[in-house]
Amino acid sequence: MNISEDVLSTGSSLASQVHAAAVNGDKGALQRLIVGNSALRDKEDRFGRTPLMYCVLADRVDCADALLKAGADVNKTDHSRRTALHLAAQKGNYRFMKLLLTRRANWMQKDLEEMTPLHLSTRHRSPKCLALLLKFMAPGEVDTQDKNKQTALHWSAYYNNPEHAKLLIKHDSNIGIPDVEGKIPLHWAANHKDPSAVHTVRCILDAAPTESLLNWQDYEGRTPLHFAVADGNLTVVDVLTSYESCNITSYDNLFRTPLHWAALLGHAQIVHLLLERNKSGTIPSDSQGATPLHYAAQSNFAETVKVFLQHPSVKDDSDLEGRTSFMWAAGKGNDDVLRTMLSLKSDIDINMSDKYGGTALHAAALSGHVSTVKLLLDNDAQVDATDVMKHTPLFRACEMGHRDVIQTLIKGGARVDLVDQDGHSLLHWAALGGNADVCQILIENKINPNVQDYAGRTPLQCAAYGGYINCMAVLMENNADPNIQDKEGRTALHWSCNNGYLDAIKLLLDFAAFPNQMENNEERYTPLDYALLGERHEVIQFMLEHGALSIAAIQDIAAFKIQAVYKGYKVRKAFRDRKNLLMKHEQLRKDAAAKKREEENKRKEAEQQKGQLDTDPPRSHCSSSAPVLPCPPSPQNEGSKQDATPSKQPPASHTVQSPDPEHSRLPGRCPGRASQGDSSIDLQGTASRKPSETPIEHCRGPSACVHPRSWEGGNSSKNQGTSSVEKRRGETNGKHRRCEEGPSSARQPLCTGSGRPAEKGEDSSPAVASASQQDHPRKPNKRQDRAARPRGASQKRRTHQLRDRCSPAGSSRPGSAKGEVACADQSSLHRHTPRSKVTQDKLIGGVSSGLPLSTEASRSGCKQLYEDICASPETGVAHGPPPGQCMNIHLLPVEQRLLIIQRERSRKELFRRKNKAAAVIQRAWRSYQLRKHLSRLLHLKQLGAREVLRCTQVCTALLLQVWRKELELKFPKSISVSRTSKSPSKGSSATKYARHSVLRQIYGCSQEGKGHHPIKSSKAPAVLHLSSVNSLQSIHLDNSGRSKKFSYNLQPSSQSKNKPKL
């Protein structure tokens, strides 16, 4: 084939016809072109090549000679900076090289790789070209280095040309020059798999058989022996190790000797050779403590292992982690090596563990070699051996998901209920690896899918952490709970949201995972918070669509709930405080009422005494100066005793009736006796007893009251000679004497008890009553009654006179007061006695408190007044009167008595104001209780769910209307009664002002107008019959719905006027 066609077919482009003529060897055409255009002799194509170069490539010596004669440049370079001589040396064309060298070609010219024609000439087997170049080169130019710092000798060793090496060494080439990798020509000569490389090695070693040359290490620490062992060239290894200076145990940078490489590569013969020529007698180990036997066992070279085990210097030593070559072989699943070692070494411990507690079975289970596991189990390997992490081989298999190994171990007796040092079970490790099949196998072997480790994490959380959907599905299909929290409060949804596994989140929510579970730490993050922190936008959107909340939203909701609960607590607390306040006011009102009754009794006694002094001062003087003569008891008086029949006394029967005129005609009575007998009438009992007091209070005990008609029957014949004037004087003196005796005379037995005659020896002398008798009038002391019997004649006469006296409170029979007629000159107190309970309350304070005055409180008030008079320094009395006698108040100066009365009035006025406020509070409280009771009654009706509110409002309005009308009709109007004439308007205004001022001090606002608003009438019939309205005094009903408020409807008038009507 024509060369031009060959060049063109290969894609070369000739720049001109001169290149074509050079390639084709058309010498005539080439000369014509050059003659016609001399510049064409060095014309370059696109590769920078000249016609001369193409002549070299095409082996056109004639054309080349013609171009050289025409003046072509012999050292012209192409784009790779190569000349025609480089191309001739590369092709090994001796003729062209000789032609170009004779034309003064530059043999030191370097191309882009810095290679000279000398480097290129070493690749050919013939040394002629190399010898031609060496003839033209100086002695120092033979070691010219290329870009990799390699000389021609390096290339000769690399191409395994021993003749070239001898020729270069003969021209003084340096055999110890390292290249860029630190290799000398011996390294390149030993790095041959061809056994003929031994000649090049010998050629170099013969030139300089030094120890440094044999043990020269490159920059990776490898000697020529390392390269010879790596290539498995037994001949070169034999040559190298034949020198005594060769170091067989030399380490490279990986701390591996030539024996390690021979064992790793499985060169059994080289291993045997090296073991035999190892003069040290020890087997070196690498940086990990592994011996060549470890490498041979790991690489599954049974023959090599056999060579090692058969050598007496080899032992199965452990590496730095305590692992033997047997463990290495088990970890790699090298059953042949294991069988070889078990057969050759009978003392091998199959259960030997490394420093982490792992055995050969651990290594085999971790790698998943079922055959190796069976082999070890057949050789009595311990199936439940634990390492330092308390992992058994089954744990390793579950972690890596080796299903066959797991089943083999379970069949071999491995326990499935063990946990490691962190509390992880086999199911935890299977879930961490995402092995759904392994999880199913373990669950079938009765492992709880909700088992928790020491941190509280479940296998489901481990699977959610890795986003293993299949494993999560298997666990939840086997009743794994997705809402279990670990000790930090995280659930499986927390881990899935943290890592952004949307599919896992969907799966968890499908199995009823709670999306708002909070952590237990300080942040209290929810799964949505983890998604927000990780900026998982798709997860955030999906969680929000399924009702997920962040911790900030939950805190807002919790704050709202807490505020609502706190408001309810404050309302209940205010209710309890107001209730306690009202109960305290109620107790204060009761105390004030008791004190008021006591002061009222004192006031009445003082008014009676003042009235007596104003109406009859001379008579009081006479009665006080007249001697009291004892009168013997009369048989008629003894026989005229009658039993007073007790009965209920009217509420306002305190009017003092005039005595019967027949009393003045009693025989055997002198004026002194008459005044003395009449003076035992108790003024205090007349004025201060309760209006509603029953006859038992008047007549209980051994000394009950005697009806005044007993005087008419027994003493009418004895009082014939006595004038009416003397009788009146005696009666007035008797009244004065009773005032002097004070409260002691009020408690003296006046007449015989009801139902039995009085004893003749009964003592009638006045005595001071004890405190217990004053406080408990309904429990008379029998010992005092027996001790009060008469022991002398004077006492009997006194008792007889007391029997002839009428009862202070009057008899229960309507006709018992016929003989008693009030005198015209008696005190105004007896002329204006209150007629009813309401008028009496108006006289006291103008407030209907609903509590009647106590008789004992009145008596105690009178006694207090008596003690004040006796102890006053202004009266001049050093000591009180002796027991049985009373001091006459008329003996005191008028100014002193007025001062005492004024002081009592001021104190009672202050008490009256307090009592008014307490009465208003009591009325409000009773109103609230009544409304509450009515609301409870109305709710007991069995009505429909829709009609309950309307019917309740109608019934409540009707009841309130009826009740208010009954109260307005039946409440008696209070009449102000007093002995002194006062302005009604002034008294009522003062009372009203005192009432509102006290309430304003308590509540801070006026209570005017409360309970006086009309309620809209209803046409519904009455559902409750009000049997007794008068018994509920001072109670004004209001809207029953207001009872839920905590002010007990004590609202200011501005609010009460605007309240809605039913």
UniProtKB/Swiss-Prot annotation:
SMART domains: ANK (SM00248), IQ (SM00015). Changing residue 915 to A: Does not affect interaction with APC2. Changing residue 498 to A: Abolishes interaction with APC2. Residues 555-584, 914-943 form the IQ domain. The modification 3-hydroxyasparagine is found at residue 75. A motif (D-box 1) lies at residues 490-498. Residues 589-849, 1042-1062 are annotated as: Disordered. GO terms for biological process: animal organ development; embryonic heart tube left/right pattern formation; epithelial cilium movement involved in determination of left/right asymmetry; kidney development; negative regulation of canonical Wnt signaling pathway; pancreas development; post-embryonic development; protein localization to ciliary inversin compartment. It is found in: Cytoplasm; Cytoplasm, Cytoskeleton; Membrane; Nucleus. GO terms for cellular component: ciliary base; ciliary inversin compartment; extracellular region; membrane; microtubule; nucleus; perinuclear region of cytoplasm; spindle. The keyword Nucleus applies. ANK repeats lie at residues 13-42, 47-76, 80-110, 113-144, 148-177, 181-213, 220-250, 254-283, 288-317, 321-350, 356-385, 389-418, 422-451, 455-484, 488-517, 523-553. Strongly expressed in the primary cilia of renal cells, especially in the varicosities, swellings observed in the cilia. Localizes in the node monocilia and in other 9+0 monocilia, including those of kidney epithelial cells and the pituitary gland, but it does not localize to 9+2 cilia (at protein level). In adult, it is expressed at high level in liver and kidney. Weakly or not expressed in other tissues. It is a peripheral membrane protein. PANTHER family: ANKYRIN REPEAT AND PROTEIN KINASE DOMAIN-CONTAINING PROTEIN, INVERSIN-A. The D-box 1 (destruction box 1) mediates the interaction with APC2, and may act as a recognition signal for degradation via the ubiquitin-proteasome pathway. Interacts with microtubules. Interacts with NPHP1. Interacts with DVL1, PRICKLE (PRICKLE1 or PRICKLE2) and Strabismus (VANGL1 or VANGL2). Binds calmodulin via its IQ domains. Interacts with APC2. Interacts with alpha-, beta-, and gamma-catenin. Interacts with N-cadherin (CDH2). Interacts with NPHP3. Interacts with IQCB1; the interaction likely requires additional interactors. Component of a complex containing at least ANKS6, INVS, NEK8 and NPHP3. ANKS6 may organize complex assembly by linking INVS and NPHP3 to NEK8 and INVS may target the complex to the proximal ciliary axoneme. This is Inversin. It comes from Mus musculus (Mouse). The gene is Invs.
